[in-house]
Amino acid sequence: MAARLCCQLDPARDVLCLRPVGAESSGRTLPGSLGAVPPPSSSAVPADNGSHLSLRGLPVCSFSSAGPCALRFTSARRMETTVNAPWSLPTVLHKRTLGLSGRSMTWIEDYIKDCVFKDWEELGEEIRLKVFVLGGCRHKLVCSPAPCNFFTSA
């Protein structure tokens, strides 16, 4: 299952704010040194009712006030470049979804910081993150007439 997330870096607290598109989420806590995700302010994350998006592939928890229940994500722009890495992030995440991988998720924090924060700081990309992959959720789909692809395109 996959869903789209809005996100923005809060430089004052050095945290990444994530929420599902179309949800009035209070945010989620990311474990480790990334810190807690604060509730998005109206100026930090633009309001989006998601009316232009298809609901297919969005788990029910995407519209929960607490946000999605499982965050398994990477920058969609990095999806193609991870295949030559020592571990392919999409493959690892898919295996975790199927319960086949024992790898700890602590390494994902370093991956995110390297791919996200470093590029923001060094390349000056303000709109760095557009689409994140969210998977591993066990909730039913809002619309499930057809099987949902694990990774969706932008």
UniProtKB/Swiss-Prot annotation:
Give the record's GO biological process terms: DNA-templated transcription; symbiont-mediated activation of host NF-kappaB cascade; symbiont-mediated arrest of host cell cycle during G2/M transition; viral genome replication
Tell me the compartments it is located in. Host cytoplasm; Host nucleus; Host mitochondrion
Q: Which domain of life is it from?
A: Viruses
Where is region (Mitochondrial targeting sequence) located?
68-117
Q: Which GO terms describe its cellular component?
A: host cell mitochondrion; host cell nucleus
Coarsely, its chief localization is host cell
Report if keyword Amino-acid biosynthesis is assigned.
no
List keywords of the entry alphabetically. Activation of host NF-kappa-B by virus, Activator, Apoptosis, Host cytoplasm, Host G2/M cell cycle arrest by virus, Host mitochondrion, Host nucleus, Host-virus interaction, Modulation of host cell cycle by virus, Transcription, Transcription regulation
Q: What does its PTM field state?
A: A fraction may be phosphorylated in insect cells and HepG2 cells, a human hepatoblastoma cell line. Phosphorylated in vitro by host protein kinase C or mitogen-activated protein kinase. N-acetylated in insect cells.
Please list where the region (Disordered) is annotated. Answer: 28-48
InterPro entries assigned = Transactivation_prot_X
> Per the record, where are the segments of Low complexity compositional bias?
30-46
Q: Name the family the entry cites.
A: Belongs to the orthohepadnavirus protein X family.
The record's note on quaternary structure and interaction partners says: May form homodimer. May interact with host CEBPA, CFLAR, CREB1, DDB1, E4F1, HBXIP, HSPD1/HSP60, NFKBIA, POLR2E and SMAD4. Interacts with host SMC5-SMC6 complex and induces its degradation. Interacts with host TRPC4AP; leading to prevent ubiquitination of TRPC4AP. Interacts with host PLSCR1; this interaction promotes ubiquitination and degradation of HBx and impairs HBx-mediated cell proliferation.
Please describe what this protein does: Multifunctional protein that plays a role in silencing host antiviral defenses and promoting viral transcription. Does not seem to be essential for HBV infection. May be directly involved in development of cirrhosis and liver cancer (hepatocellular carcinoma). Most of cytosolic activities involve modulation of cytosolic calcium. The effect on apoptosis is controversial depending on the cell types in which the studies have been conducted. May induce apoptosis by localizing in mitochondria and causing loss of mitochondrial membrane potential.
This chain belongs to the protein called: Protein X
The protein's organism comes out as Hepatitis B virus genotype F2 subtype adw4q (isolate Senegal/9203) (HBV-F)
Lineage of this protein's species?
Answer: Viruses, Riboviria, Pararnavirae, Artverviricota, Revtraviricetes
